[in-house]
Amino acid sequence: MMFRGFLRWCAARPEYREMTDRDAGKAAAIVENLPSNTRRTDALEAAQVPGWWAGVEQLSNRTASAYLRALLLTGARREELAALTWANVDFQWRKLTLADKVETTRTIPLSPYMAQMLAALPKAGPFVFASTGKAGRITDTRASHAKALQSAAIVGLTIHGLRRSFSLLGEAAGAPAGAIAQVMGHKPSAT
C-alpha cells in the first residue's frame, strides 16, 4: 500500500528516520479505513494475445495503437515508454534507452518488428509517441485500450496488466526470469 510504502521510505532516510514511526501504517484506525492490500493479477493469457493484438491494430489512433503494442513487447512502465524520445531510439544498433522510475536509464533490445513499427510513426517533435496535447506526448490511452479490449471480448485488463503479461508470456516462452526482470527494469534479486 502506498501509505505504508511512504512510511518505509521515510524510515529508510536518515533525515526522516527519527520523525517516522514505521509501524504507524499498521494501526487499526488506519488499516480499517484503507483499501485492502491485494495484488493485481490481470494479464493476457497466451490465447488472448491474437484477439487483443487485432483489436489494438484496428484502433484509429495509430500512435495509441503503437504505444499499446510497444508496452506489451517491451514490458516497460507506461511513463517510461510515453517519455521515450527519438534521441533514445537507436535504429542502427537496435536498442532503446528508457528512463526508469528511479532516475536511471536502462537499455533494452529493439526487435525488428518494433523498429519497423516505430519508424512508421510520424516524427512530430522529440517524443516517439507524440501528441498534440499540452505534454506533447501520449498521456492516457485507457479509452483506446478499452476499445481494443471490447473488440477482443477481454474484460478487466489494465494498462499495467500489459507489463505483467510481458513477464508471464516471457516465462511461458522459456526466457530466464532474470533476463525478463532486467528488461523490465526490476532490481536484481539475491535469490
Language model regions located:
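Active-site/catalytic core of tyrosine-dependent DNA strand-transfer enzymes
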Residues: 43-50, 93, 109-155
